A protein has these predicted regions:
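Generic recognition of short, well-ordered alpha-helical interface segments
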Residues: 167, 193, 197, 217, ...
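Juxtamembrane amphipathic/hinge helix adjacent to a transmembrane helix
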Residues: 200-214, 237-242
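Long, charge-rich alpha-helical interaction segments
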Residues: 184-204, 212
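Core alpha-helical transmembrane segments of integral membrane proteins
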Residues: 216-244
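Extracytoplasmic/lumenal ectodomains and periplasmic regions of secretory and membrane proteins
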Residues: 176-180, 215-220
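Soluble catalytic domains of membrane acyltransferases
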Residues: 4-10, 14-176, 225, 239-305
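Long hydrophobic alpha-helical segments that form multi-pass transmembrane helix bundles
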Residues: 168-175, 180-190
């Protein structure tokens, strides 16, 4: 329920966080389940946020288990349809919890849902494809639903990491009949074949984007300059907090986006209340200008250094 409600707002927020998001083969965003989305994983939770925001149907995401350690993190992530899955590096004692993740994935798929798994099983803040884990192949091999399962490869890439106003390239591949990816009797042989085939499908979909070549006119640049200084105190505070919380991790972009998603509406609410107390009409006009200026900042400059 919460996921469905906030998804449109996430799409709006992405337009203030990313300079441009290019999507190829958009028609596949309308596909219905059961679908296992297999994607690369260059930028932590932001990958899932972007893919989920543009898909028409709800998506459930398999996400790294160490992000679920704190109760409030666990609560929030589960509201976003995220399911924890653990790697050996996150503690051998947690590996038994993966049975829950795979069982949940099977239930979702057997009920005609969509599950997203990042087949590399690791995020290194790079568009370079990493070695594959066996989780995606396991889900396909264990699937027992009545409706044929499709596997949809998606490549996602960024022009920069740990930075604002990024350009994103997302390319959706062709849906593949899962049975064609596991044609053998031996489970181990099927896993190797599955990963090899998916790599062949996924590699061409990862296209390094160039920074969006947007050349605003002088008025847009002027508005962005005003907006830059209007937002600078908020941006500085959020930036410093995000850096402190994500030091030596890959979560900076995800945490920065999450903070802005929550705090920027509060910022606008406070400014709006102050302006409304002074003049309702002019307060509304100025508030609209502030919102427009925020978008022009993304087009013209990087407000966080």
């Amino acid at each position: 329920m919460i996921y469905t409600i906030i998804k449109p707002f996430i799409r709006i927020a992405l337009s203030f966080f990313c300079r441009k998001i290019y999507i190829q083969h958009r028609n596949n965003l309308q596909l219905k389940g059961p679908i296992l989305i297999v994607a690369n994983h260059p930028n932590s939770f932001l990958d899932a946020i972007i893919i989920g925001a543009f898909f028409k149907k709800p998506i459930h995401f398999l996400a790294r288990g160490d992000a679920f350690k704190k109760n409030h993190h666990r609560f929030f992530l589960r509201l976003l349809n995220m399911i924890p899955i653990y790697r050996l590096s996150e503690g051998k004692e947690n590996l038994h919890l993966n049975e829950y993740a795979f069982n949940q994935s099977q239930k979702i798929l057997e009920n005609g849902g969509i599950v997203l798994i990042f087949i590399e099983g690791i995020c290194l803040l790079t568009n370079q494809l990493q070695p594959f884990k066996k989780g995606a192949a396991r889900i396909v091999l264990d699937y027992q639903g009545k409706t044929d399962l499709k596997v949809l490869p998606i490549g996602i890439a960024y022009d920069r990491f740990n930075a604002w106003a990024k350009t994103v390239q997302m390319v959706l591949g062709k849906p593949i009949d899962s049975k064609s990816l596991v044609p053998f009797q031996e489970r181990a042989k099927n896993m190797i074949f599955f990963n090899n085939q998916i790599r062949q499908e996924l590699e061409p979909l990862i296209i390094q984007p160039e920074p969006a070549n947007i050349q605003p006119n002088i008025w847009v640049y002027f508005i962005s300059s005003i907006g830059f200084y209007l937002h600078l105190p908020l941006f500085k505070i959020i930036n410093q907090f995000a850096k402190a919380k994500t030091k030596n991790t890959v979560f900076y972009d995800s945490v920065l986006f999450g903070l802005l998603f929550i705090l920027y509406p509060l910022f606008l609410l406070i400014i709006g209340m102050i302006l409304n107390a002074l003049s309702a009409l002019w307060g509304f006009i100025i508030l609209c200008f502030i919102i427009i200026a925020a978008r022009t900042i993304v087009l013209c400059r990087n407000p966080i250094k």
